């Protein structure tokens, strides 16, 4: 049965390709004038997504009518839930925050034209406040919530505590905060906060605090130069780190931009030999890091 379905599908696709091949080129030409995009609407919907993901006490500017306060007993409230889960994974969260910050830093005029500047700044500040709160000096919170336990229940996060108890799970363990000095996570958090300090300069009175935490988190990441604590935790089943020099490089660059201190540029340069290379080549590996 599966083979017959496969053959029918293949035949249909082949016939479709033959029909397209028989059409004159003029019939397949698409004019650039046929395409139009409302970038302001795309921006609004993107920011709305981040507001859907907000954890903890919701700010009064949150526009998602079906959301309410949640996970209010977390050791560190706020931040974003990951995907459709109820866990706060700081590695992808910090990367997303750094991209938001970079967008504002590089294209402020474009954001002004969309009419979404206030909403953008609000959402960026919301996640940066959380990342700053995760910095505890000699260690950092890199995850809140247990992914394995979280995946045993599907429902609205506002009812998570009841769902966990209904499953016979210990809610306190399900919302435990994981701490460490993982270079990848602390480095990414440092990059997000340093980029945020640059992007929000003149728009927020918190930039000095963001930069202070960025520098400390970078110190932890650089001194540790390991992801063992992170990769041996619940996080490894979801966002395992394969290396950390890319995050150190990324963070050092943003700290140089934010402070102008040569030492950060020197650090960034020193990491380059440790960045991944293409197989059988001396060329830097094309990976997520190429976005910068």
Label for each model-derived stretch:
Residues 14, 18-22:
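Hydrophobic core
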Residues 2-14:
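Bacterial N-terminal signal peptides that target proteins for export
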Residues 32-292:
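Glycan-recognition and catalytic cores of secretory/periplasmic carbohydrate-active enzymes
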Residues 22-34:
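Sec-dependent signal peptide cleavage junction
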